[in-house]
From Swiss-Prot:
Record PTM: Phosphorylated by CDC28 at the onset of S-phase. This phosphorylation, specifically phosphorylation of Thr-84 promotes interaction with DPB11 leading to DNA replication. Dephosphorylated by CDC14.
Organism encoding this protein: Saccharomyces cerevisiae (strain ATCC 204508 / S288c) (Baker's yeast)
Compositionally biased tracts (Acidic residues): 285-301
Principal localisation: nucleus
A molecular-function term among this protein's GO annotations: single-stranded DNA binding
Compositional bias per record (Basic residues), positions renumbered to this chain: 418-427, 435-453
Name assigned to this protein: DNA replication regulator SLD2
Region (Disordered): 284-345, 391-453
Positions with biased composition (Basic and acidic residues): 302-327
Length: 453
């Protein structure tokens, strides 16, 4: 309502202020506004409208903040319980589940007695309230009364121990046979508990230390168990020589909080493992010696060159791996030193090589000289031409002078340059891929764009 007039006045005042600044090059003051009557009235009108608008907004805010009273409906509504957790038709979150459900208390009234009379009311709080309702009264005479909601959380009450609130109790409360706490008596380790021979195990609390005496719990360790060896190490007085019957007892055990067992193996177990390792190494050494003897017998049929290669390996000698028994006496050390002095020849792996058979006959070796066919043909042509012209002596002499190798007709293999073998290239070039995969090149068509296909 007032917003339109306020906006209009604000525009007029701003236009006058800007005109005054452009004209006088300064902002208008109060004296300038008071001197002009029309401008002064516009400012007064603007201030009054502004106050009215603020008062109107405050009234609207107060009306919105007033809460309407909730009117309870007289008739009951049909409530459909959905899958969400609810208590009597009202949805609750999972964080409100610590509240126990409301326990109904059914009240029945006797016939022909006033409902308002308290003496005529009887409360049935039994485990099955529905049965009592059907037997005692009709639905018209029954009313439902709800108890206040109680929390599930329990609180410990140590007032029965007659201890101060600032002091923590040092003993657990006793219980009678029915499970109720005894307020007068205390259960302390120094005083004998009031326990008879036929009392149940629930007489004390679950964490009471006196429960051990009641149940007669003792720790018995049998000497035939798997922990005997651990105990002998921990207590030297229990150490005895192990018998043959107990030699094969399993050493597996479960961790116990009462007995500290060493995690390492015992000396007897280490000695057994050592003897087994010594036996295995002895068998392996015997097998190696047998294989070497068989190899020496087979090497007798080889040629002299192979024998020279074998004799060249005598420098590569190794000492045998001799496992020393730490449990043997010092008398056996001489035998072990004698074994260490022995040498075993290391036989390397050989590769089968097929060699060409060599013949030492000098006649067959000299007969294999190579001849140049082209030079032989040139020499024959020159002879035929010389015979036809009749000057065989002159041509043959000049031929022998300029070409002494052609006169003999033999080309020495030593003077002929041997073709160098091209080594394998380190990198595969891109051009090799073009040649191998038959890829098109840049200048593949000499005659125009399209060539022969």
């Amino acid at each position: 309502m007032y917003s339109f007039e306020l906006d209009k006045l604000k525009i007029e005042l701003k236009t006058w202020e800007h005109d005054f600044i452009d004209k006088n090059k300064r902002e208008p003051t109060r004296d300038d506004i008071k001197s002009l009557r029309t401008v002064r009235q516009m400012y007064k009108q603007y201030s009054t409208l502004k106050k009215k608008q603020s008062l109107q907004r405050q009234k609207v805010d107060t009306q919105e903040s007033v809460e309407l009273p909730a009117h309870k409906k007289d008739h009951d509504e049909v409530v459909e319980i959905g899958p969400t957790p609810q208590v009597y038709g009202k949805a609750i979150s999972i964080f409100d589940m610590n509240l126990s459900p409301i326990k109904p208390i059914y009240m029945t009234f006797t016939n022909n007695i006033d409902v308002n009379n308290d003496n005529s009311k009887t409360i049935s709080n039994e485990s099955s309230p529905r049965k009592t309702i059907l037997l005692k009264s009709s639905p018209a005479d029954r009313t439902l009364v709800a108890e206040p909601i109680s929390s599930v959380k329990r609180q410990l009450n140590f007032q029965m121990l007659n201890a101060s609130s600032t002091r923590t109790p040092t003993s657990s409360p006793c219980k009678n046979r029915n499970g109720k706490l005894v307020e007068i008596k205390k259960c302390s380790p120094t005083i004998n508990p009031p326990l008879e021979s036929g009392k149940p195990s629930g007489y004390y609390g679950p964490n009471s230390p006196l429960k051990l005496d009641e149940e007669n719990i003792h720790l018995n360790i049998s000497l035939n168990s798997s922990t005997k060896r651990r105990l002998q190490i921990a207590y030297p007085s229990l150490q005895k020589t192990p018998s043959k019957d107990q030699a094969d007892i399993s050493t597996s055990f479960s961790p116990s909080p009462l007995i500290r067992r060493p995690l390492t193996k015992s000396l007897i177990e280490l000695a057994r493992e050592h003897t087994e390792i010594v036996k295995e190494f002895g068998v392996l050494q015997e097998e190696d010696i047998e294989e070497e003897e068989e190899g020496e017998e087979g090497e007798n049929g080889y040629d002299e060159k192979n024998h020279e290669d074998d004799f060249g390996l005598e420098d590569e000698l190794i000492r045998p791996k001799v496992v020393k028994d730490i449990f043997q006496e010092d008398d056996d050390n001489d035998d072990s030193q004698a074994r260490e002095d022995t040498f075993i020849r290391k036989r390397p792996k050989r590769r089968k090589v097929i060699r060409r058979l060599r013949d030492n006959d000098p006649e067959t070796e000299t007969a294999g000289f190579e001849r140049d066919v082209h030079k032989e043909l040139v020499k024959l042509k020159r002879r035929k031409v010389a015979e036809f012209l009749g000057s065989t002596s002159q041509i043959s002499d000049t031929e022998f002078e300029h070409d002494p190798e052609a006169s003999s007709g033999v080309v020495s293999s030593e003077q002929k340059p041997t073709a160098k073998r091209k080594g394998r290239k380190k990198y595969n070039l891109v051009s090799n891929n073009f040649r191998r995969l038959k890829l098109p090149k840049k200048n593949r068509f000499s005659n125009g764009r399209w060539g022969r296909r």
